[in-house]
Amino acid sequence: MHTNLYAMANYDELLKDGISHGMCEKFQKEWGNPGVKELCYKYFRGQDFCIEHNWPELKWLEENMRGKTIEYGILINQTIQMSQGERRELALLGNSDLTIDVFDVCDITIRHGSKLHLNVHDGCFVYVSMHDDSVLDIVSKEGTGRVCVSHFGGSVINGGLIDKFNEKL
């Protein structure tokens, strides 16, 4: 019970911090009493705001969310290997390192110092949004899979399957 009260206090603190960064009224009204799943959903819905304002801060995420968000598509300072499965959206935050096999459509955001090793299979489409000092490594060398990159920062190594590269710097 104490843990839930602690988490709730931190989520209230997070809302106040979001408001101080200019969170829109709609998101403020919809805030409610979110659990981890709802916070992950809110992150993906408000990702542009989160990236623009570096919100929530990585330190807050590390202290309050690390290890609780993987099943909802958010990695925080973690290293894993996985297949896409049902996951359609992923975010790598902090110094995460993900090796993933993608078989369908997937939208992946990589931030901070995270690394994404992408194995793209035939017929799939992957959209990657790169920020900060992130690294994209496309492991696949050939095939009919397509990768579209919006590059706001970071570096690409082994980018042979990139179909479209939008420089946003």
Descriptions of predicted regions:
Residues 1-112, 117, 121, 125-169:
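Short, glycine-biased loop/turn motifs at secondary-structure junctions and
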